[in-house]
């Protein structure tokens, strides 16, 4: 017979060697150490005993006399005798005398009290099969009711057959329930099927009064019946009793605990409680329930072969071969492995072989995904999860049914100071340019005018180089672009940039040649300059209209408007006002009393007060709509510019706005988009190549100026941020630690104080009294500006002060060596005449011979007429001795100089 060591059993069962040796000694096995071996059968008994505290029925310790298993047989139906069986007991307990009675096939057994037999109708019996272990009840489990176990000197276990006594048959006739023959043997329980679970407090007694002593009738001893392994189940598991009663259990003997003796029940409950406490202590000592610590099963014994490896239970992997897979753009190593049905180890191994050090949680780059796809023979296609969250695409997929003509949206673009806003003012008869600081536009403004009964929407963009993003947004949100060029100034850099934005957006373009009232105006020069960048005038055979105008006198304004309306008519601009609104955000800000405010232009549909809208990751319900003249309205139609109030945050300028049905819909979609953005930020792997590492080290060595930027509108904030990020060189840079739309707050001051040497830059915002006071207390500098030029100049000056000064050399004097004198223990003294500048003592000096620098040191001694001199001026003679140098010859030139620090600027 195969034998197995104690230590192998302990590992398999999840127990300690010491604990298992103790249990083995209790069972009487000859075990002394962890390498002691026992048979496979004994191993199964030992593990069952160590884990559940139970022993197989009929188990005898080595050297113990075998005990007979007592099998009870039911009496003939007419025999009014109660059969009592004694359990298999330990050697200390003498077995009770039993009597064997021949079995009859049609007998049924029923659990009931004496009172139930007389007073109630017979109930259908439920049969369960259990195994009755021969161990003490100290480790048995009680759920709904006590589990039947055989305990030392236990009394009250009885076999109840159908009673034939006269008192049981008075007034009632017991109906025999039908049974199916059970193919397996075991101990069965017959009890009444009950509709609801009955707890341990339920009376299960054999009489209606005081506890009755167990029956003293003798039964004959019979040969022990062979015991087959059966399934252990809870005999009081009422859930399993609620199904089909006739579930395959045959008519066999029935063993029940006689709970009429309360001492038995109480003793069982005490032992059960003790067992549970011990189990909890073991779990606590092991740091929680031991994984895999299950009762030892016979089928597990196969893995306990002596000298062999333990069987490893591995998760069965699918053998499905994947040839094509769709993965998100940002995918981790383990996610890719799952998609292609490979292990993480295989994926990491391939990348490791190519010199890529990755872990399972690292994100894969596009190149790495291509390499892996080729290696595993999988066709990989990437998908953008944001496509599912694209509310604009979902809006566009719905067909417009009631199309109507809409006003054109015109964007005015061009170089700074070329008269864009003044031209728009003339059209609107307003004075917007006067209100802008410095006379330059620093915001995107949208206005609507009427010409010949038709409305035209104008969008004004800044011309300053810092406002590139604003011009790009203006081109995207428009139908026609007007490029304003000053006739006296010609084509400038921002003019070319505006034309590039317009062409990129695929928008029609009209050239307005402004300032035609000036004598220096030269329209032909403009046409020739624009022709060089493929913008050919219509009268030169091109496709672009050139309209001469003057914002000062009003010359050509009507011609310009008619050209716009003609172009719009050719474009057949239409929209469906019956649909929900779709708009584009041209500017956003925070206004006191209103919160986040977005300036939008409706592209399609109608926007109403109360509509639920989404703008990128921002959402809200429209609370108010204000037109460009300040009037409030309830709704606005296509191509109408307006300011809306009611969003939860300041939206990004250039974002698309779409109205939806419910608040829940917009909120969930916005939150999902925000979550995606966060995940995208996290997708940037922290792994860095050697080149990246060098760049990071160099970046860390840069001196930085920490700044906090606060602006009145989102567009200006973006412009300032973009300009400041460009202010850097190999030594200094601007570190933007915080940015926001709105006024300077106390929290901004606190943040600046926490950041060393941080400066708060406010654009078109002013700090309040309390903020000023706190800034003064904490020593935080708050600088406010209304013109972007001034802000950038100040930051440049601050960065210049942080840069290391440039060391320049300034020559202070020259002296020619006329004669040399050698003095013992002193050195060589050069007799010189100062030919230029002033020679000073202790100044730096270099010896030049035939135009070549021979030595560089400093003047250690300067004398005139044997007296020490502090300096010798041009034309005078003197004696000079250089420090640590004596090889001076006649004709040499001694030149003195000093280092001068010069502050640099960006």
Swiss-Prot record:
Chain positions covered by the region annotation G2: 439-443
Biased composition (Basic residues): 299-313
First-listed, main subcellular location of the protein, grouped into a coarse class: cytoplasm
Annotated region (Disordered), positions in chain: 94-125, 165-232, 270-321
Domain of life: Bacteria
Keywords: Cytoplasm, GTP-binding, Initiation factor, Nucleotide-binding, Protein biosynthesis
Domain tr-type G: from-to ranges: 405-574
Region (G1), start-end ranges: 414-421
Compartments where found: Cytoplasm
Ranges for region G4: 514-517
One family name in Pfam for this protein: IF2_N
UniProt key word Cytoplasm: yes
UniProt-annotated binding residues for GTP: 414-421, 460-464, 514-517
Family, as annotated: Belongs to the TRAFAC class translation factor GTPase superfamily. Classic translation factor GTPase family. IF-2 subfamily.
PANTHER family: TR-TYPE G DOMAIN-CONTAINING PROTEIN, TRANSLATION INITIATION FACTOR IF-2-RELATED
Official protein name in the record: Translation initiation factor IF-2
Originating organism: Sulfurovum sp. (strain NBC37-1)
